[in-house]
């Protein structure tokens, strides 16, 4: 019973007849409170059907100048990525066939800028690299590999590591282990591995060797990307990279095996099974390189190493699989197709 009704009953119970014995006229019902009126309105509305919803305002028009470029299902700006890849491929082919020493120059520039990207990335985690000796020593390692081969590379690598440690000593003992360890890691990861691409290019058939190496790595990326987007269902390493799937890896294996057989049989005139092994070695190394780069970026809590290359990120985002594959390609091609 509502409070208004109980109050009304209380008034009626205390009403006494007048002197003539007649009952007094009944009091007029008090107006319903706002709460009661709202409740009655809801009940009535429920009986008659819910009122029509209010029209939603139309979204504001998107300015074509500020609209973001559409991305592919894999999260990349595919047209920009293809354009950059074609431009880089044209640059590499030009250096290999017009003036091969210029290929070493391009690799040296990539090492110097990649060192800068890595220094910025590691700085976000309060790990400060010895950038100057890494960049200068890295370029020296590329030059030594071109001029003196593996022996020159080994000497330049040793001197660069010593220079990195001495440079860091000048900054004091605070975080020395973390900074020095990160700096030595970068020396081994970037210029030391990039130097193997220069070693591939140095022989008389170096252009063919570099193209076989880069094209097979590209087949790994393309095969994994295409099959992963179309058929990818089972993540390979979800903790490290959600984009890697076993279906994509199978596509990489297929594409790399075919590319390896074609290059080893048609270009180097070797047995087909050597091409299969070459392709398998490249695809496994490229996949591990991608995952390793993803681990580094997760550790540093960054998405990309930079933004120099539209659709790819930074230089290091493009070199993630090429760097370790350069060393593997050099070893396998030296074993399977020795220089005459």
Residue ranges and their predicted role:
Residues 2-5, 14-22, 28-43, 47-49, ...:
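Membrane-embedded alpha-helical bundles of polytopic integral membrane proteins
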Residues 82, 118, 222, 291-294, ...:
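Generic detector of well-ordered alpha-helical packing
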Residues 217-229, 285-298:
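Short helical (or helix-break) motifs at transmembrane helix termini and adjacent helical loops
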Residues 220-223, 250-251, 316-326:
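Membrane-embedded alpha-helical segments of transport systems
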Residues 256-257, 318, 325, 334:
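Hydrophobic transmembrane alpha-helices of multi-pass small-molecule transporters
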Residues 299-322:
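Interfacial loop-to-transmembrane junctions
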Residues 331-340:
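Juxtamembrane boundary at the C-terminal end of a transmembrane helix
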């Amino acid at each position: 019973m509502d409070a208004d009704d109980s109050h009304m009953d209380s008034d009626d119970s205390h009403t006494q007849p007048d002197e003539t014995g007649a009952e007094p006229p009944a009091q007029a019902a008090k107006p319903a409170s706002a709460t009661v009126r709202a409740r009655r309105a809801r009940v009535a509305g429920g009986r008659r059907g819910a009122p029509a919803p209010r029209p939603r305002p139309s979204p504001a028009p998107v300015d074509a100048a500020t609209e973001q470029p559409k991305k592919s299902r894999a999260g990349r700006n595919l047209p920009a990525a293809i354009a950059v890849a074609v431009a880089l491929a044209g640059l590499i082919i030009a250096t290999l066939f017009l003036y091969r020493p210029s290929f070493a120059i391009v690799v040296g520039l990539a090492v110097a800028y990649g060192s800068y990207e890595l220094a910025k990335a590691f700085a976000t985690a309060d790990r400060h690299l010895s950038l100057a000796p890494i960049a200068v020593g890295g370029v020296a390692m590329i030059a030594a590999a071109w001029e003196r081969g593996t022996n020159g590379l080994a000497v330049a690598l040793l001197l660069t590591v010593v220079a990195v440690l001495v440079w860091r000593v000048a900054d004091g003992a605070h975080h020395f282990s973390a900074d020095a360890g990160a700096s030595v890691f970068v020396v081994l990861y970037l210029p030391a591995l990039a130097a193997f691409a220069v070693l591939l290019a140095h022989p008389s058939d170096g252009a063919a060797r570099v193209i076989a190496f880069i094209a097979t790595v590209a087949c790994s990326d393309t095969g994994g990307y295409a099959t992963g987007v179309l058929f990818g269902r089972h993540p390979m390493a979800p903790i490290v990279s959600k984009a890697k799937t076993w279906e994509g890896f199978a596509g990489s294996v297929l594409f790399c095996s075919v590319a390896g057989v074609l290059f080893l049989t048609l270009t180097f005139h070797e047995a087909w099974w050597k091409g299969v092994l070459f392709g398998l070695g490249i695809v496994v190394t490229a996949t591990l390189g991608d995952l390793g780069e993803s681990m580094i970026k997760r550790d540093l809590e960054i998405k990309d190493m930079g933004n120099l290359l539209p659709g790819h990120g930074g230089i290091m985002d493009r070199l993630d699989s090429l760097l370790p594959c350069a060393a593997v390609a050099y070893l396998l091609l030296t074993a399977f197709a020795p220089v005459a």
